[in-house]
């Protein structure tokens, strides 16, 4: 059984929902290409700086902007923070794999971390949370969910091959 935990911002906990539904035998929107025994240990939606500090237990870098305590980073910082989130939630939930997502300005950061491997990618859609364009924000979210689950599948294949 592979244990997975998520700490999500721009994907709004939807990566966790997809993983849980798949693990229980009723996949939602994602077309899974693997067969693996997974369990979602925890799925956290953490868009704020205070959530990162108080729940994930680390001090995040200073964002370019904040909107009601919601962190707004550039793409490079999003990648860094997503990896920090993935590592922190993996430790917090005592899981095999942690997933972190965050997006402010740009394509966002999507990170997956195990004890000995990590990777960071982006969505395929650029958006800017400071000047919300609902359609672009939702397109970026959809792309981020898809890309996170694809990356998880590659991790699981590698995990099972060990």
Swiss-Prot record:
InterPro entries: HcgF (IPR009625). Pfam families: HcgF (PF06787). Transmembrane segments: none annotated. Belongs to the UPF0254 family. This is UPF0254 protein MTH1148 homolog. It comes from Methanothermobacter thermautotrophicus (strain Winter).
């Amino acid at each position: 059984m592979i244990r997975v935990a998520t700490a999500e911002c721009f994907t709004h906990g939807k990566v966790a929902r997809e993983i849980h539904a798949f693990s229980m035998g009723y996949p939602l929107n994602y077309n899974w290409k693997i067969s693996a025994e997974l369990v979602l240990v925890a799925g956290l939606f953490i868009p704020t700086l205070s959530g990162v500090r108080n729940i994930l237990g680390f001090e995040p870098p200073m964002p370019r902007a904040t909107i009601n305590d919601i962190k707004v980073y550039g793409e490079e910082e999003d990648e860094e923070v997503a990896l920090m989130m993935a590592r922190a939630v993996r430790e917090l939930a005592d899981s095999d794999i942690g997933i972190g997502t965050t997006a402010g300005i740009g394509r966002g950061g999507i990170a997956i971390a195990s004890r000995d491997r990590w990777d960071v990618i982006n969505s395929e859609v650029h958006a800017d949370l400071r000047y919300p364009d609902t359609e672009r924000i939702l397109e970026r979210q959809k792309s981020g969910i898809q890309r996170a689950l694809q990356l998880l599948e590659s991790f699981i294949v590698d995990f099972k091959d060990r």
